[in-house]
Amino acid sequence: MGKLMNIGFGNMVNTDKIVSIIASDSAPAKRMISRGKEQETLIDATQGRRTKSVIFTENNKIILSALQPETLAGRFNGNASEGDYDTKE
């Protein structure tokens, strides 16, 4: 297991499993969210806040986050923020 990235409100995602991070306001993103709800592959990590980004994982899970895609991309690229943990020993 690699690095865990904070996606908001104490929720963590393994960065080794992330395929893409996109903004949630496009029509294709909204369709993917609807499809994820239907197929029960959606994980809502927004804590009731507005969804701002959608994270796709390699095991076909769709994760919703209340953080901006730019914020998540910065954390993904190594600009460590509070709540990011390295699990490699």
Pin down the residues of each PLM region.
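Amphipathic alpha-helical interface surfaces
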Residues: 14, 28-29, 35, 51, ...
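Phosphoinositide-dependent membrane-docking surfaces
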Residues: 15-23
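C-terminal structural segments of small proteins and small subunits
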Residues: 54-89
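Short aromatic-glycine motifs in intrinsically disordered, low-complexity regions
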Residues: 1-12
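Short, structured protein-protein interaction patches enriched in aromatics and acidic/basic residues
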Residues: 44-58
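Compact, glycine-rich, soluble single-domain proteins
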Residues: 26, 30-39, 44
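Short glycine-enriched loop/turn motifs at secondary-structure junctions
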Residues: 13-16, 56-58
